[in-house]
């Protein structure tokens, strides 16, 4: 218990525990060190994180930056008291946005805000961030922990992430040669990833299931644990395929808004993506969400990834080469569709077939 000093109140009396913050820093140092890479080998604790771009091996780089959060998936982590994986989600949401532009993630910074700092909880979260950074090959070079009593309810917290990467000038994606007839490949997701969780939570509430109840769609797992499956990080397989095949014309990260909102972002205005919905292998979690919530297929497709977390556009003659390169790195690939002509004012994504929910 804190005590007021002779001259009145202390910061601790106001709800901010500096000692807890210092303890958290000591707890996370080994995890942070584990993310070191060429260009970043400093310790945390300075006023700013350092990165040596020349040491990373670039000659004429263009920097690419992205920031994101985890959204209301955090509420499940908080309610289920399971904090080990949301840091992976945080990194994934940022670095996947970098790689779609052909950039290699270099470094990452996080912002962790809470009403009352729990060093063990914070260490679990940052441990997940470090795990995500290792998987993406980027260094965790700094961050901010903000204890803000009165801003958040007890136990609540929020996360934001910031990633910076680089690509050699002239190698950024999308390329300028996307053409009618090019093939769209879909890379499988690991689950819901980090979008649509306000709807997920509404459906779970309607189901009457508790977070520790057996997941109806994942044998041997509790509902909360299954829904917290971390977002897949596609960085290393995609970078390897980009560099080995020189055949990937465009990539799109399928996040909030699904196919119709994300694929057109990387396409020229005169082309649309024709998606064959029968090619999508819908994971059981999405079937359960659709049936339990009575969610129509159209709404599922504009809210969730529905089993495809990333798409790649390649020329038809390069499909086998790119698929082989990605499958060699453990990715599950489907031929999802093709590029077609698009009339002015028409939708950038059109469907054929139906989604097997």
Curated annotation (Swiss-Prot):
Family matches, as Gene3D superfamilies: PurM-like C-terminal domain (3.90.650.10), PurM-like, N-terminal domain (3.30.1330.10)
Disulfide bonds: none
Record's subcellular location: Cytoplasm
EC primary class: ligase
GO term, biological process aspect, one: adenine biosynthetic process
Molecular function in Gene Ontology: ATP binding; phosphoribosylamine-glycine ligase activity; phosphoribosylformylglycinamidine cyclo-ligase activity
GO CC field: cytosol
InterPro entries, A to Z: PurM-like_C_dom (IPR010918), PurM-like_C_sf (IPR036676), PurM-like_N (IPR016188), PurM-like_N_sf (IPR036921), PurM_cligase (IPR004733)
Ligase listed as a keyword: yes
TM annotation in the entry: none
Keyword flag Aminoacyl-tRNA synthetase: no
Catalysed reactions listed for this entry: 2-formamido-N(1)-(5-O-phospho-beta-D-ribosyl)acetamidine + ATP = 5-amino-1-(5-phospho-beta-D-ribosyl)imidazole + ADP + phosphate + H(+)
Annotated metabolic or biological route of this protein: Purine metabolism; IMP biosynthesis via de novo pathway; 5-amino-1-(5-phospho-D-ribosyl)imidazole from N(2)-formyl-N(1)-(5-phospho-D-ribosyl)glycinamide: step 2/2
Enzyme Commission number(s) from the entry: 6.3.3.1
Keywords: ATP-binding, Cytoplasm, Ligase, Nucleotide-binding, Purine biosynthesis
Family: Belongs to the AIR synthase family.
PANTHER family: TRIFUNCTIONAL PURINE BIOSYNTHETIC PROTEIN ADENOSINE-3 (PTHR10520:SF12), TRIFUNCTIONAL PURINE BIOSYNTHETIC PROTEIN ADENOSINE-3-RELATED (PTHR10520)
Protein name: Phosphoribosylformylglycinamidine cyclo-ligase
Name of the coding gene: purM
């Amino acid at each position: 218990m804190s005590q007021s000093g002779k001259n009145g109140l202390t910061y601790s009396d106001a709800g901010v525990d500096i000692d807890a913050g210092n303890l958290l820093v000591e707890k996370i140092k080994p995890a942070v060190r584990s993310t070191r890479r060429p260009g970043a080998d400093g310790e945390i604790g300075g006023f700013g994180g350092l990165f040596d771009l020349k040491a990373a091996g670039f000659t004429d780089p263009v920097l690419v930056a992205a920031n994101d959060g985890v959204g209301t998936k955090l509420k499940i982590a908080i309610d289920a008291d399971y904090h080990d994986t949301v840091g992976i989600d945080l990194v994934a949401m940022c670095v996947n946005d970098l790689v779609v532009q052909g950039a290699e993630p270099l470094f990452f910074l996080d912002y962790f805000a809470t009403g009352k700092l729990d060093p063990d909880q914070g260490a679990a979260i940052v441990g997940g961030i470090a795990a995500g950074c290792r998987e993406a090959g980027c260094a965790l070079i700094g961050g901010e922990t903000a204890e803000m009593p009165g801003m958040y309810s007890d136990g609540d917290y929020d996360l934001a992430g910031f990633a910076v990467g680089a690509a050699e000038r002239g190698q950024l994606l999308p390329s300028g040669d996307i053409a009618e007839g090019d093939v769209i490949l879909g890379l499988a997701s690991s689950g819901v990833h980090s979008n649509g969780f306000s709807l997920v939570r509404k459906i779970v509430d309607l189901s009457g299931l508790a977070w520790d109840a057996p997941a109806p769609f994942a044998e041997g797992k509790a509902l909360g644990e299954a829904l917290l499956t971390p977002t897949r990080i596609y960085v290393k397989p995609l970078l390897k395929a980009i560099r080995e095949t020189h055949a990937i014309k465009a990539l799109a990260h399928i996040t909030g808004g699904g196919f119709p909102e994300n694929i057109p972002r990387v396409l020229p205005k005169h082309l649309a993506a024709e998606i064959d919905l029968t090619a999508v292998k819908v994971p059981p979690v999405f079937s359960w969400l659709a049936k339990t919530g009575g969610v129509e297929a159209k709404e599922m497709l504009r809210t969730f990834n529905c089993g495809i977390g990333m798409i790649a556009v390649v020329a038809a003659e390069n499909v086998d080469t790119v698929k082989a390169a990605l499958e060699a790195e453990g990715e599950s690939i489907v031929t999802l569709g093709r590029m077609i002509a698009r009339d002015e004012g028409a939708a950038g994504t059109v469907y054929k077939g139906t989604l097997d929910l």
